């Protein structure tokens, strides 16, 4: 498939099945672990570091799977799912630029949670800025990201790292 600058939910689910890019390329997780509904912008230029950016959105509905179990009587989106979305987007960026292999989260520097996503929210927006791409034996991207709910920043993460591996046997 030709690189695009936006992707619909159906296209993202095709990525999970290995149908969007080359069959042996990186994949997004399938439902329910896919943590965004669309990519509204992706570019290998721009962003705060001038090395690329990814913008994505998740529509919040009270019936989302995690609200029913986290927590009963006090529903809130787990913070780790927002963080995972940032890793998912970083891995998608690597696949989108043509990096071979399967993506794996390698860590991050600093993470801050200053708010929460409740069932009454409408929209989560992710803004991921690529700060570094290493293209050697290991292909890796490093990004800085933030997550906004209804326009208010609630999570930030610095130095998110995702690597691409042609074999994950000994990972």
UniProtKB/Swiss-Prot annotation:
Predominant location of this chain? cytoplasm
Source taxon at top rank: Bacteria
Its organism's taxonomic lineage begins at:
Bacteria, Pseudomonadati, Pseudomonadota, Gammaproteobacteria, Lysobacterales
* Any GO BP annotation: unsaturated fatty acid biosynthetic process
Give the Gene3D superfamilies listed for this entry: Hotdog Thioesterase
Q: Which residues form the active site?
A: 70
Q: Which reaction does it catalyse?
A: a (3R)-hydroxyacyl-[ACP] = a (2E)-enoyl-[ACP] + H2O; (3R)-hydroxydecanoyl-[ACP] = (2E)-decenoyl-[ACP] + H2O; (2E)-decenoyl-[ACP] = (3Z)-decenoyl-[ACP]
Q: What is this protein called?
A: 3-hydroxydecanoyl-[acyl-carrier-protein] dehydratase
The gene is fabA
GO cellular component terms listed in the entry, alphabetical order? cytoplasm
* The UniProt record lists the keyword Lipid metabolism: yes
Its biological purpose is as follows: Necessary for the introduction of cis unsaturation into fatty acids. Catalyzes the dehydration of (3R)-3-hydroxydecanoyl-ACP to E-(2)-decenoyl-ACP and then its isomerization to Z-(3)-decenoyl-ACP. Can catalyze the dehydratase reaction for beta-hydroxyacyl-ACPs with saturated chain lengths up to 16:0, being most active on intermediate chain length.
Residues that span the membrane, as ranges: none
A GO molecular function assigned to this protein is: (3R)-hydroxyacyl-[acyl-carrier-protein] dehydratase activity
Task: Provide this UniProt record's keywords sorted from A to Z.
Answer: Cytoplasm, Fatty acid biosynthesis, Fatty acid metabolism, Isomerase, Lipid biosynthesis, Lipid metabolism, Lyase
Describe its partners and assembly state. Answer: Homodimer.
What family classification does the UniProt entry report for this protein?
A: Belongs to the thioester dehydratase family. FabA subfamily.
- Origin organism is Xanthomonas euvesicatoria pv. vesicatoria (strain 85-10)
Q: What is its EC number?
A: 4.2.1.59, 5.3.3.14
Where is it located? Cytoplasm
């Amino acid at each position: 498939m030709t690189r695009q600058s936006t992707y619909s939910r159906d296209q993202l689910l095709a990525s999970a099945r290995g149908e969007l890019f080359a069959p042996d390329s990186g994949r997004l997780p399938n439902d329910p672990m896919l943590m965004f509904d669309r990519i509204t912008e992706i570019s290998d230029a721009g962003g705060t570091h001038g090395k690329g950016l990814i913008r994505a959105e998740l529509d919040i509905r009270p019936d989302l799977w995690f609200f029913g179990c986290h927590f009963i009587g006090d529903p809130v989106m787990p913070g780790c799912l927002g963080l995972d979305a940032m890793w998912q987007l970083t891995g998608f960026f690597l696949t989108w630029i043509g990096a071979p292999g399967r993506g794996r989260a390698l860590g991050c520097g600093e993470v801050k949670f200053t708010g929460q996503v409740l069932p009454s929210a409408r929209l989560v927006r992710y803004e991921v800025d690529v700060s570094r791409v290493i293209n050697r034996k290991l292909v890796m991207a490093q990004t800085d990201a933030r997550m906004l709910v209804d326009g208010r920043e609630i999570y930030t993460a610095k130095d998110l790292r995702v690597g691409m591996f042609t074999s994950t046997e000994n990972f």
